Amino acid sequence: MNDTTWSDKLRLRSHFGFTLMPFAKNMKAAQMFDSSSQRELLRGLQLWTDVRGLCLVSGPPGVGKSITLRRFVYGLDQALWRVIDFSYLPSTPTGFLRSLCRKLGLPMRMHGADLFDQAQSYLVSHQQDHGAHPLILVDDGEGLPVPVIDLLRRLTSSDLDSDDHFSIVLSGTEDLLATLAHPGLEPLRTRFSYVQGLRPFGLEDTRNYVRFNLERADTPPKLFNASAGRPRSINKLAVQALIQAAVQGRDEIDGDFMNALILSHPLFQGPPGG
């Protein structure tokens, strides 16, 4: 019921008097709400650009890791940084190297060793040749197997580790942390120059997030007091509540309405999450 069509959104906006649809997930980076934990992560990433190297971001699903990384990338000087981001992560080292070479505009090679050598050589020399420091952004990394994650370390190993010719940000859930605990990845664990976990919203952040979305939609009423601490879950419940309220002809949504909705929602039995 959360997957609404454009005409459905128009009807919802008309029912509540919104000029924009609140709780959207496709907002521009500069317009996004940031919690105290997200601000800490963003500031840490900005300071880490002076250090560079390997960075690890972790946190439960739906707490805003990808959104915060988008804000971080949005704020980078494109003349000084070249961001190579992965929206699809191959599950084999050769597949990862092929995807990396494709994004770098490099030719395909038959053997994995040749793919590795040309990608590493290109990344190591890119800043000297073009002036921009390469940044590989690997988001949703919890599904990566150990050999692919170790490949990231091996890519950065050159010139006896004397300089960080390019940087990598690896982000994922607790499952990624469990994979990183593998004994074979100990050399990688020791090389992260910055590690930060992203926390779910606290109660005050949740209130501010709801208020932020409603003010952006140009509507004055208070929608509800608070929900769970994960932005993705808040969005799901908020949109569900808006639709259900419109179906019932309600103009206001209060705590009792939200409690009843959560209890009847098949995906939110108990405290909201996911």
Per-segment meaning from a language model:
Residues 73-75, 176-191:
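Short regulatory helix/loop adjacent to the ATP-binding pocket of P-loop NTPases
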Residues 102-104, 174-175, 183, 201-218:
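Conserved AAA+ ATPase "sensor/coupling" helix adjacent to the nucleotide-binding pocket
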Residues 18-25, 81, 91-110:
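Conserved NTP-binding/hydrolysis module of P-loop NTPases
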Residues 1-51, 263, 267-274:
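A short, basic N-terminal segment
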Residues 2-12, 165, 204, 208-211, ...:
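C-terminal alpha-helical "lid" subdomain
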Residues 13-14, 92-95, 107-151, 159-164, ...:
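Mid-core helix/loop region of P-loop NTP-binding domains shared across ATPases and GTPases
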Residues 86-89, 180-183, 193-205:
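Conserved AAA+ ATPase "SRH/arginine-finger" region at the nucleotide-binding site
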Residues 51-71:
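Walker A/P-loop nucleotide-binding motif
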